Amino acid sequence: DILQGNWYTFKSEREVEVNNLMNTQKYMSGYPWGKLYKYSVLEHYQFPEGYWFEDTPISFILAAMPLKIVTISDIVYGYRINPQGITATASLSKKSIDSYWVTELCLEEFSKFGLIYDQRAYEYLLKQTLMNAGRINKQHKKIREAEFILTSQLIRKYFSDKCYTKNEKMRDVEKA
């Protein structure tokens, strides 16, 4: 259903870093590029408009679907690191809070894709929580606190007491 190739990142012709994507059926990067998709996979999928980090659903939703994902080691994409781009400058912008809103949207749309709020989704949400916190780490303290409270509410709403992390490194996140 999805074929994912390897990629490299570069700042200039002299600064190139090749990603070492393992050839596995289970790993899919969150990037929308560097992949071939079967038409039916994206037939009803739409990137959320007006948000930064709109590619979050690729890993949050599509990776949770019962799809066959194959990776190949061939380099199929070159990603230029842009020091003025959203990824590099997001933490300085008020739009960085979009990372939370897209996460909330992903969880709201699970039923649209026939997905369940299971252990895999819970573990992903914990990892996404760290990503979101990193993206807003330069925002005012009140914004960071509000995002923390909203994230806590999401966890209670969708997972209540039915999931606990199996990842030792995520236990501190879970306790917070």
What label would you give each PLM region?
Residues N20-S99:
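Conserved nucleotide-sugar donor-binding catalytic segment
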Residues D118-Y124, E145-I149:
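Short, charged, amphipathic alpha-helical segments
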Residues W101-A121, I155-K169:
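C-terminal, non-catalytic tails of nucleotide-sugar-dependent glycosyltransferases
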Residues K138-A176:
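Membrane-interface aromatic/basic loop that binds lipid-linked glycans or pyrophosphate carriers
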Residues F110-G114, A133-K141:
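Secondary-structure edge/capping motif, primarily at the C-terminal ends of alpha-helices
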Residues R120-R135:
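Amphipathic alpha-helical repeat scaffolds of TPR domains
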Residues D1-V16:
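Conserved donor NDP-sugar-binding/catalytic core segment of glycosyltransferases
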Residues L3-Q4, V70-I72, Q119-A121:
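A structural signal for short, well-ordered beta-strand segments and their strand-loop junctions
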